[in-house]
């Protein structure tokens, strides 16, 4: 038996090589891997000695040789293949263990294009693909996590086809991922990220019980190991819908730096939000906005879930808590609650990935765009359009309202008072309806809107929403502006003595 080992990631390769040697494998290797194995006492033959052909062009050509690919690709059950192999002195290679040049790591560490180009692996993917194609005769490995499993299987002497099949699938996933990253990088560097093709590649984290509905299948996939590093289940398992709501809640609660922010989300939209002097007070005020919708919702905590906050949350049923951190006493509070799910990022404050791009599936394809972010200076650069300026406290509330609006389904309007959301209308086909629905809900909750501020994610097309806001005592408004009737909106604000600011940036969310 013969194995070819050629790896960039040397983790576990010595132990793996020794086990193969003990099992009677002749080991071939290249360059740095050959040297590393030899230094660690493993009997190994360099590929150039095996092929009788030297490495060429500063190592660019090492394994691209008929004796390598013929040794991998010929079918052991095909008499014609066996005959050709003998005639051409091609020896079988029964196991291929390859992982690839660190292209992605190089692009992160360096902007030198020559260096980046040299870290595009050619021979490695070719060997992986060859071995995967002939998976019935050749075992292919590209992940150090599989070394132990393969050795155990080899020792048992019973290598079923399903085991080989899974290694084959993993190999093609690996090379596809590698090539996709290269293509995306080149398009990012030379075509602004929008080339003729776009590859979206994620790694599975786990299967969900089902998708959005019980008859659908679902799973969570991640970019750059984000969830593996920043999402730990402490109680319960996340469903598909939990994950989308967690995403919405986390995005909002994490948008205020280190502030003790609490966001409550239901079906992707905020039904509560507050920033008060501490997290307990933030939760109390966030819940007031719509305690009915908060039932069974998702609570995001920009800080630590402690015992006091846990006791307060435990007064009603919430389905999910996502917190930057969770202490043991807080977990104990929920021991008797079977249905609640608790997740943490094990950090001081909530963490976002800040993915640069966003996409949505549409029938027959997908639409792809730069991610929408509320700019750091977006509110600071907002232009005062009215005669009246907002007070210092109103400005704080306006910024909160503006950010909530940016994370809420269009059309929306958001009312904030003293650091807490007091009313919200979202997902409406007209902005005036959103304004009216928000006010009606606030009245139902017994909330006083007098002195609050108002934000909208897009411009007001008419003055009607301003007229409506005046009836409940709105003192200041922030919106993008850009309507052909902006002058009417400004006039209405001045009539009611409101402060009005235009940011110049729209935040539609569909």
Swiss-Prot record:
Entry's Gene Ontology cellular component terms: cytosol
Protein family membership: Belongs to the PurH family.
Name recorded for this polypeptide: Bifunctional purine biosynthesis protein PurH
Disulphide bonds in the chain: none
Upper classification of the organism: Bacteria, Pseudomonadati, Campylobacterota, Epsilonproteobacteria, Campylobacterales
Start and end residues of each MGS-like domain: 1-142
Record's keyword annotation contains Transferase: yes
SMART domains, per database record: AICARFT_IMPCHas (SM00798), MGS (SM00851)
EC number from the UniProt entry: 2.1.2.3, 3.5.4.10
Highest taxon above the source species: Bacteria
Cross-referenced Pfam families: AICARFT_IMPCHas (PF01808), MGS (PF02142)
Catalytic activity: (6R)-10-formyltetrahydrofolate + 5-amino-1-(5-phospho-beta-D-ribosyl)imidazole-4-carboxamide = 5-formamido-1-(5-phospho-D-ribosyl)imidazole-4-carboxamide + (6S)-5,6,7,8-tetrahydrofolate; IMP + H2O = 5-formamido-1-(5-phospho-D-ribosyl)imidazole-4-carboxamide
Recorded GO MF terms: IMP cyclohydrolase activity; phosphoribosylaminoimidazolecarboxamide formyltransferase activity
GO biological process: 'de novo' IMP biosynthetic process
Pathway(s) the chain acts in: Purine metabolism; IMP biosynthesis via de novo pathway; 5-formamido-1-(5-phospho-D-ribosyl)imidazole-4-carboxamide from 5-amino-1-(5-phospho-D-ribosyl)imidazole-4-carboxamide (10-formyl THF route): step 1/1; Purine metabolism; IMP biosynthesis via de novo pathway; IMP from 5-formamido-1-(5-phospho-D-ribosyl)imidazole-4-carboxamide: step 1/1
Domain note: The IMP cyclohydrolase activity resides in the N-terminal region.
Keyword annotations of the record: Hydrolase, Multifunctional enzyme, Purine biosynthesis, Transferase
